[in-house]
Structures are given as structure tokens and as C-alpha cells.
């Protein structure tokens, strides 16, 4: 299991670039950003690339109801992103038929974005199986370790049904360390729990108490132990719940580093 490091899109470039350099030095395999209406995940990846020349760069995820594949391709080119380093996470957003949308969109996405590894955002068994059958990777958000293991089985079953090797499985593990860790995790989680029916069903499926879907620990040792339980993931992405400063982000990255291998 390799380890990536992730932040929220729009992180100050003066922080993002040196943070990526620090994470590369520490042995992280990849740097990740989400994408949201207020900030571009691809722009955050471009800042990472200025500071780190070896780690993979991933965005998880861009919603196809907000950006078309052609728009994404244009941004990749404008920003000068190296396609060989990219993991491009894509999701259905608020479309009415997400499974159909992502199944039917894939050929056009591949045509618009050649040479880029495409990662499907999934929550339930059907989307997970689709990712296993047709995509280059599958990405999960907000999960307990037991769900990660179950999700991996769904992905692998989809791959078996399609007669192919299973693609890598990625996931964000929201992680806070310190005396206020539980509060920070609960606050971030509460925003997503009622965002839309997909997330409501996702949290209900896991049946985990509110404020516990992720890692909240008083010290780095306990956090490391919790992260090690996400064995269902090929790459666990530490989604940092820390102040948006280089000092705090860098300290968390250092505390949670481990020996990793490139996710290829």
C-alpha cells in the first residue's frame, strides 16, 4: 500500500509548491487535490509540479456535470501538465443517472484525453464494478477501513467479469492529529453527510457513528496505526485536516510518512 498526500483545491501556491517538494522528499508516491466550484484542482496540481518533479499528480474528482472532457483537456494543456504523471479522477456530479452517465461517457473521455490515466469516482457496488471493468483506477471518498475492503471486492469482481486485471484502488482518508482532531474530522464530515442523496446513502451503508469516518488521533503513532488499516486501498491518500500553512501541512506530512512505492 502506497501513500499519497492531498489538500483542498486552491491552496496558496506559495504553500503548494514547497509542500509537494517536502512530500516528495518524504517518500509519498503522489500528490492530490480535490476540485470544486471555487477552485481548480488542476491548477493546484500545476503548483505541485513546480515543486516536485517525480511524484504522480492526481485530482479527485472533477464532476462531469461542471466540466466537459474537452474543457478538461484544454486546461491540462494550458497548465502544461505532464500527462504521464496524471491520475484524473472523474465523477458524475449531480446527474440524474450517474451510472449510465459514466458508462456512456468513457469512450468520449478517452478520445478527448489520450495518454491520461482515468480514475472513476465510486461509492456503491455498481459504480465500483464499472470502474473495475473499464477504468484505469477507482477512487473512494469518506470510508472506514471495512468499507475500503468491501469496495475493493466490488472492483475486483467487476474486473473478473470483464476478463481483465483489476485497476488500482485509491481513497481519501481524512486525517487530523492533535488534541482537537476529533472536532476537525467531525466538522469536515458533517459538510458531506447531507450534501446529496448519494452521500447520504454512502454514509448509511457504512453505519459508522458520525464524526468517525476517517482518522482522528491525538498523536502520530495512533494515526499511523489507523491509516495502516486501510489495506483495501492500493494508495491511501492522507487528506490533511490541518491549517493551510506550510508549517502545519508539512508537519503532518512528516508525521505520517512511510516507505512507499510508486503507484503505477
What residues fall within each predicted segment?
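An alpha-helical appendage that flanks or caps ligand/catalytic pockets
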Residues: 92-114, 149-249, 258-264
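Acidic (Asp/Glu)-rich catalytic clusters
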Residues: 18-25, 45-56, 73-86, 113, ...
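Short hydrophobic interaction/assembly module
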Residues: 53-71
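Residue-level preference for nonpolar/small residues embedded in alpha-helices
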Residues: 15, 40, 71, 101, ...
